[in-house]
């Protein structure tokens, strides 16, 4: 995603915010640690990115767009779109009820969970991933230094199919959230969302002391059954980008990668279209984006099934293989020179079997 931000002219503006730099990811399970550093990855590319409060990050991008001369409207709802061939008229309404219309030769729908075009034109399609729930907040992380690497993003395996994200920000706050099957959260004690999340945090040995009595910046929020797809990624006069196409899961930051790369790819094709050039949207857009989506999907499924647990926490790991998997975690899911991208649907399963067979022989 850093290449996309760089090409769009956002890098300097984001740097000025002083966001926490991210050099990899740390996975923890029952006290055992697996570390991935992006500098060790198989695919040539960026060795770092950022850990960001999304509100501040998104506002930085929007402000930079305005500086570039792009108008941005806030608190405005799209209520309808009419297409005439590839031309369109979009009706919008602000918070005061004022309506206006926007004429366009082409629409790029990057509305995220809003899913404007899919909802207006009945294009939503269920994901093939099971429904899951995320329960999270931001905390004032006063005891962060209890961790030996206090500024590292950490993913904790709480139990099979249930994991925790810990994302420290440069402002001293930390995002922390539990993710898993909705039934897991029904057994949580507490009569309020805050009590429920505090109970969950207290049940995780890796976080219990660090998060005890910390201040919650906002009442814990829920995202549920968030995995969703669409019947098509493009049509006459429009293209869908980011979460509007398909959102898989918060793990591995796949949403940010797919959002930035899909926007970058779509922008190039929209420019070609507006210049009168022929574009094969299926081949040049959908097939490319599905390569990334399907690679991430294989890793998301392997994560919840426990396959990645076996791989991440194995003894005597092969550095070359670890670097290939690291590239996927860094977002390079289009590099088919990487066997763990090219053969994503089978490579992880084969590796898991090899590790289990080796471990059985050494017992």
Please report, for each region that a protein language model flagged, where it lies by residue.
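FAD/FMN-dependent oxidoreductases across multiple families
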Residues: 186-270, 275-286, 291
């Amino acid at each position: 995603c850093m290449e996309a931000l760089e090409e769009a002219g956002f890098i300097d503006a984001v740097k000025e915010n002083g966001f926490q730099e991210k050099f990899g990811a740390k996975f923890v399970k029952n006290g055992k640690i697996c570390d991935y550093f992006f500098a060790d990855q198989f695919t040539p590319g960026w060795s770092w990115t950022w850990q960001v409060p999304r509100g501040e990050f998104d506002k930085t991008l929007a402000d930079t767009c305005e500086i570039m001369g792009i108008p941005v409207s806030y608190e405005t709802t799209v209520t309808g779109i009419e297409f005439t061939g590839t031309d369109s008229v979009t009706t919008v309404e602000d918070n005061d009820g004022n309506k206006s219309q926007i004429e366009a030769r082409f629409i790029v729908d990057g509305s995220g969970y809003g899913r404007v075009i899919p909802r207006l034109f009945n294009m939503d399609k269920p994901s093939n991933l099971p429904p899951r729930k995320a329960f999270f907040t931001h905390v004032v992380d006063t005891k962060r230094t209890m961790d030996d690497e206090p500024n590292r993003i950490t993913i904790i395996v709480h139990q099979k199919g249930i994991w925790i994200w810990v994302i420290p920000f440069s402002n001293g706050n930390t995002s922390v959230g539990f993710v898993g099957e909705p039934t897991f959260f029904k057994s949580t004690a507490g009569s309020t969302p805050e009590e429920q999340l505090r109970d969950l945090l207290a049940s995780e040995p890796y976080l219990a002391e660090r998060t005890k009595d910390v201040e919650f910046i906002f009442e814990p929020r829920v995202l549920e059954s968030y995995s969703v797809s669409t019947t098509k990624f493009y049509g006459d006069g429009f293209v869908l980008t980011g979460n509007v196409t398909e959102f898989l899961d918060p793990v591995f930051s796949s949403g940010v990668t797919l959002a930035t790369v899909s926007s970058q790819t779509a922008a190039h094709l929209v420019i070609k279209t507006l210049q009168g050039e022929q574009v094969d949207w299926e081949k040049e857009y959908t097939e490319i984006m599905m390569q990334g989506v399907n690679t991430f999907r294989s890793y998301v499924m392997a994560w919840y099934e426990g396959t990645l647990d076996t791989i991440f926490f194995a003894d005597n790991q092969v550095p070359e293989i670890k670097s290939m998997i690291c590239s996927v975690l860094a977002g390079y899911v289009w590099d088919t020179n990487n066997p763990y991208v090219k053969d994503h649907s089978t490579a992880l399963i084969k590796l898991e079997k090899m590790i289990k067979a080796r471990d059985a022989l050494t017992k």
